[in-house]
Amino acid sequence: MYHCFRLRRGQDLYEEIEAYVKAHHIAAGAVVSGVGCVSRWRLRDATGVRVRSGEEDVEIVSLMGTVSEYGCHLHASFSREDLSAFGGHLLPGCTVTVSYT
């Protein structure tokens, strides 16, 4: 079964994905793609220790991971206006500013 949904300006990217999974009783699944922009981002590195965050308009260039009734494990990559890219483990605190149709 496939699911596709759109988020609105001001929603939290991570929390809305997690809420969708719970609301639709998805026991296990995968996020294979996501597009749009966020104005606030929050990521964790692979060690699980360092958390980085920022407030700037960045574009989602990659969004993938696993989802389940026990939680989400999502990776995101973002691109800045100068086209530099960065990414990590997606955390709550990423505010959607633009979503595409």
Language-model-derived ranges and their functions:
Residues 1-9:
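Short amphipathic
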Residues 101:
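Conserved small/polar residues in nucleotide/adenosyl-binding loops
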Residues 8, 32-34, 63, 85-86:
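Short glycine/serine/threonine-biased micro-segments
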Residues 12-54:
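Short, well-structured hydrophobic secondary-structure segments
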Residues 52-94:
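Mid-chain, well-packed structural core segment of small domains
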Residues 15, 19-27, 80-84, 91-92, ...:
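Short, intrinsically disordered, mixed-charge
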